[in-house]
Curated annotation (Swiss-Prot):
Protein name: Fluoride-specific ion channel FluC
Family: Belongs to the fluoride channel Fluc/FEX (TC 1.A.43) family.
Superkingdom of the source species: Bacteria
Described purpose of this protein according to its UniProt entry: Fluoride-specific ion channel. Important for reducing fluoride concentration in the cell, thus reducing its toxicity.
Compartments where found: Cell inner membrane
Membrane topology category: Multi-pass membrane protein
Classification lineage: Bacteria, Pseudomonadati, Pseudomonadota, Gammaproteobacteria, Enterobacterales
Amino acids binding Na(+): 75, 78
Regions crossing the membrane: 4-24, 33-53, 72-92, 100-120
Keywords, in A-Z order: Cell inner membrane, Cell membrane, Ion channel, Ion transport, Membrane, Metal-binding, Sodium, Transmembrane, Transmembrane helix, Transport
Length: 124
């Protein structure tokens, strides 16, 4: 159990530092879109997809490596990667309606909660 905790901890730290570095370098390119954030979200989605596809074929590997990459690194880099893989699994299972619903709920739910936070902070 301690090796899994350490794996997630190390992966999360590395992902978080990489997210900070990429955002620092790229977010000032445009005042309209956070290019760094978009970049880490896309990179995280690619990495988690590649990682899970690899780990599904390589069952001999210690589960700590999978958790270091997915929960740790991609979780630290971005939570969008987890969201993406969940939607892809729904699509692969032929659950188009659920996939679309998941996309819409995550997108609009996140936007609404962020808006709520801004409204609440403005009121304080």
């Amino acid at each position: 159990m301690i090796n899994i905790i350490l794996a997630i901890f190390i992966g999360g730290g590395l992902g978080s530092v990489l997210r900070w570095f990429i955002s620092l370098r790229l977010n000032n390119i445009s005042s309209n879109i956070a290019i760094g954030t978009l970049t880490v979200n896309c990179i995280g989605a690619l990495i988690i997809g590649l990682g899970l596809a690899y780990f599904n074929k390589s069952t001999h590997l210690d589960p700590a490596w999978k958790l270091m990459l997915t929960t740790g690194f991609c979780g630290g880099l971005t939570t969008f990667s987890t969201f993406s893989v969940e939607v892809v699994y729904l699509l692969l299972d032929g659950k188009l309606g659920w996939a679309l619903g998941t996309v819409l709920l995550n997108l609009f739910g996140s936007l609404l909660m962020t808006m709520l936070a801004f409204v609440l902070m403005h009121e304080l």
